[in-house]
Structure formats: structure tokens, C-alpha cells
Amino acid sequence: MKVAVLGAAGGIGQALALLLKTQLPSGSELSLYDIAPVTPGVAVDLSHIPTAVKIKGFSGEDATPALEGADVVLISAGVARKPGMDRSDLFNVNAGIVKNLVQQVAKNCPKACIGIITNPVNTTVAIAAEVLKKAGVYDKNKLFGVTTLDIIRSNTFVAELKGKQPGEVEVPVIGGHSGVTILPLLSQVPGVSFTEQEVADLTKRIQNAGTEVVEAKAGGGSATLSMGQAAARFGLSLVRALQGEQGVVECAYVEGDGQYARFFSQPLLLGKNGVEERKSIGTLSAFEQNALEGMLDTLKKDIALGKEFVNK
């Protein structure tokens, strides 16, 4: 199994690469790519860690050598948020980066599963889909927006509030991956109940958690380490499912049946070909139903922006 990380010299990319080097199954290959000249050195650094995962790093304009034969491609390349910026302020720079890299994926490993980490995910996934379509290689079961950070944050905050072990809590999060489009389904967490105020406060904290980190880092960066962990969790789940493990479920932002929006984050059963089944979002509370209806305009606009970017 070969996994490629594009944007591997950045804060998320390095954290992700470290976790994959230590946790991918023995015999896996890991290839790192970034425009930055330091990238081969990041691979050499990681190569000294004693795990049976072969690693190589590539830099420059051409990602081809990193992509050849890749089964999974995780894209974290782009600029990070600064204080006062919304994820959508990143759009102008990151849209071009994602378009370029996905064109290279389409050419070199068209059958790979692609996980988009680069923000704004609501829009960059739509860009990737249009690029893959134009190249004639789009498979909606193999393109994912990685929203796992919303899930791990939800798990952490709920566990803290309710005195649970974080590993025992799993909160489904649906919708998109910024602001009001992030909707944790707190009513579906087994064995835990919340007051209306707790639901309102937790939902807001989960939606604004990225800003919490940006402000705490005081201009020195955004959520890179927790995002690296989230991306690793998603990437490793995908690898396990591709290798035939049964019952692997993760939430991610994918093209579905369009019931809510063309792209929508929901629980997915993963399998040998990517998405095996888009699972139902279940019964929502009145608060969640309201929040869902209230986000759809924003989500649809974000998606339209991506489509327009590629077709302009």
C-alpha cells in the first residue's frame, strides 16, 4: 500500500508524515512531496525511525515521482490561517494549489483515493471533483474531504464536559468543515445527555475550535498537530478498509445523493473501493434539524464557488 502526502513540509504535513511512518502497516510505502526544498530531508529525518515503512521525499514543481503507484493521496498543501482570517479567506491561494495538485493526481494515479485536507474543504473538494471530471477519471467513491478534526474535537470536548474517557466517545459530525456548516450530532452520543444550553455551547465551541487555536498561537500558526492526528486517523482507516478490513466507518465530506447538498459530510462505511456505503444521518433533534436547514445555503454557495473556479 502506497500513501502519498502532498504538502509534506508544512505543519500538518510533517505531523501527518510522522504519524504515518510510525503507524502504517509493515511493508507500506510513504512518499512525501512539497514544493519546499526541505522535503527530501524531512523524509531522511523520518527514515531513521525504526518501522517497516519505506519513505522517500520529493520537492520542486513536479509531484509525479511521489504519486506514481499511490493508493491513497492526502493533500495538505496550502497556506495556513492567520488571526482574523476565516477558512474562506484562504480560498484564493489554496484553490489554485489544489487544482494543480489534483491535475497531477489525475495524470499519475487516477485510481487513488484522495483525501483533501487543504482549507476551505467545503470548496476545495468541489474543485478537486471538477478537475477529476475534466480528466475523465472522477469516482465519487474515492474523493473525500477530511473532516475528522471536527470529530476528534467533538469527542474531546464531550469527554471533558461529561467526565468520560475520550476514547469511549464517538460523535458523528455532519454537514461541512467550516463555521455553521459543522454540525455535531450530540443527540446521537450513546449514554450521554445534554441540557439545551450545553448543546448550544458545545456546538459553538466545536464550530469555532479552529479559531481557538489560531488565537492561542498568537499569529504563529493554526491547528497543525491535531489536524495531523485527524488526517492520520482518516488515512489509516482508509488503508485498513482498502486492505479488506470490514466495518471501518468514518465521517467525511463526499458527493452523495444530493439530498442536502451535492457534497455533504456523513458517516461512511469504507471498503476496497473507497466509499462502500453512505450511511444515514439518523434521527436529528429539533436543534440539529434547525441547524441543518440553516447551514445549507452557506454550504451550497461554498460548493458553487469551487465549481466556478475550475470552469471560469
UniProtKB/Swiss-Prot annotation:
Origin: domain of life: Bacteria
GO biological processes: malate metabolic process; tricarboxylic acid cycle
PANTHER family per the UniProt record, alphabetical: MALATE AND LACTATE DEHYDROGENASE, MALATE DEHYDROGENASE, MITOCHONDRIAL
GO molecular-function terms, A-Z: L-malate dehydrogenase (NAD+) activity
UniProt family annotation: Belongs to the LDH/MDH superfamily. MDH type 1 family.
Protein name as it appears in the record: Malate dehydrogenase
Enzyme class: oxidoreductase
Subunit annotation: Homodimer.
Gene: mdh
Protein role: Catalyzes the reversible oxidation of malate to oxaloacetate.
Phylogenetic lineage: Bacteria, Pseudomonadati, Pseudomonadota, Gammaproteobacteria, Enterobacterales
